Amino acid sequence: MPGLKDGLKDNKKILLLSVGLLVASIVGLSFMKGSTINTNNLINTDTMQFTKPESVLEKGIDYKVVLKTSVGDITIDLFENETPDTVNSFLFLIGQRYYEGVTFHRVIKNFVIQTGDPTGTGSGGPGYTIDDEITSRKYKPYTLGMANAGPDTNGSQFFITSGNIPQSAMSNLDGNYTIFGEVVEGFAVVDSIERVTTDSNDKPANNVTVESIQILEN
């Protein structure tokens, strides 16, 4: 497992699912090494900002979303009953067209693909944070999770786990990052994004974008 395997061996590779301020000097970060995820504090950007998400989640409705990416569609079943605040925020931002045109700004083979930052830098957020909703559910391949900057700092950035993510990496995610959905269609699209060429910061050499997100209600 290139990259991740080396990091798991020598603890030198820091896997960042960044939803916070990323500057030349990363002073003040509390680093999590190996296959865990490190982020820092949210900052305001020139993108849309909100003080809190409006209440858009309706009881009794089963929600799915279709991520329409530049390389194909990914259908995700959301866990609205288990993580209502997270799903509500996600649906609110979708309704605001917040995610349209965002890139997958971090791709780590055999670990995760990450998106949800309109700035494309890993430093963007919606202007508010929501608390973690940790349940008994465990990470598995093709799981949808929230990136964070520590406990109760979820914003807009999210990730999908690799189809080949090792058990050790999943165990390190468990209990630290809210699980709020799982891929039900478009597994090959996730795989294709994971295989793109990236630079030393895990940023794809050629942009893969979320063109739009469709909400399906049942």
Locate predicted features.
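Cyclophilin-like peptidyl-prolyl cis-trans isomerases
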Residues: 1-218
